[in-house]
Amino acid sequence: MLPTLIRRLSRALLWFAASSIVLVLVFRWVPPPGTALMVERKVQSWVNGEPIDLQRDWEPWENISDELKVAVIAGEDQKFASHWGFDIPAIQAALAYNERGGNVRGASTLTQQVAKNLFLWSGRSWFRKGLEAWFTALIELFWSKERILEVYLNSAEWGKGVFGAQAAARYHFGVDASRLSRQQAAQLAAVLPSPIKWSASRPSAYVASRAGWIRRQMSQLGGPSYLMQLDTSRKL
């Protein structure tokens, strides 16, 4: 009986590995039609008796403001161009901080956030974190940095039912994602840690302060010229 169970488990693991690899490869070229986070938000709205309409319009890389690209990197993952999906020093610092009893602090890279938002459910279990690590590794292996950031910008949550840069730009500022200014981009990046609680178009004092910090970080990174560092040559 035990050998049979082991064989079935092995087959299930092989099937999962193969199917997840195929899915990641497909999304290397094909825009994801939606994300696990979008499904989760839709289900939550039904359960709460407050159904929402999801706003999301996919925009290719060239139709998204370079200011927003740099703002998101400045605010969320300044080592994005150089790491392979995991920022080990940041993870170690977050673990040490959490062990000291502070508020739980994350250290997710943009790649990890793409893996989580695209494929997984919310939660902090080790099982989910293991799946996140698996998808993060696959994404870094098969996608270019430009593709990772493109999918992130088209999948990130920027308000109740608002997903992606185009929907966010229209919802908060009444412009297309390609026409976002540096200040608008910084305000959008500033609310990413808590996009339901905070508003990019009506920033609190904290969000305004964080947006100012992000603008300074953008300048230190070199502004839009920083995007030239996103290496596409190391990808398969």
UniProtKB/Swiss-Prot annotation:
It is found in: Cell inner membrane. InterPro entries: Glyco_trans_51 (IPR001264), Lysozyme-like_dom_sf (IPR023346), PBP_transglycosylase (IPR036950), Pep_trsgly (IPR011812). The keyword Membrane applies. It is a single-pass membrane protein. SUPFAM superfamilies: Lysozyme-like. Its EC number is 2.4.99.28. Pfam families: Transgly. It catalyses: [GlcNAc-(1->4)-Mur2Ac(oyl-L-Ala-gamma-D-Glu-L-Lys-D-Ala-D-Ala)](n)-di-trans,octa-cis-undecaprenyl diphosphate + beta-D-GlcNAc-(1->4)-Mur2Ac(oyl-L-Ala-gamma-D-Glu-L-Lys-D-Ala-D-Ala)-di-trans,octa-cis-undecaprenyl diphosphate = [GlcNAc-(1->4)-Mur2Ac(oyl-L-Ala-gamma-D-Glu-L-Lys-D-Ala-D-Ala)](n+1)-di-trans,octa-cis-undecaprenyl diphosphate + di-trans,octa-cis-undecaprenyl diphosphate + H(+). Pathway: Cell wall biogenesis; peptidoglycan biosynthesis. One of its GO terms (cellular component) is peptidoglycan-based cell wall. The chain crosses the membrane at residues 12-31. GO terms for biological process: cell wall organization; peptidoglycan biosynthetic process; regulation of cell shape. Peptidoglycan polymerase that catalyzes glycan chain elongation from lipid-linked precursors. HAMAP family: PGT_MtgA. Belongs to the glycosyltransferase 51 family. NCBIfam families: mono_pep_trsgly. This is Biosynthetic peptidoglycan transglycosylase. It comes from Pseudomonas putida (strain GB-1).
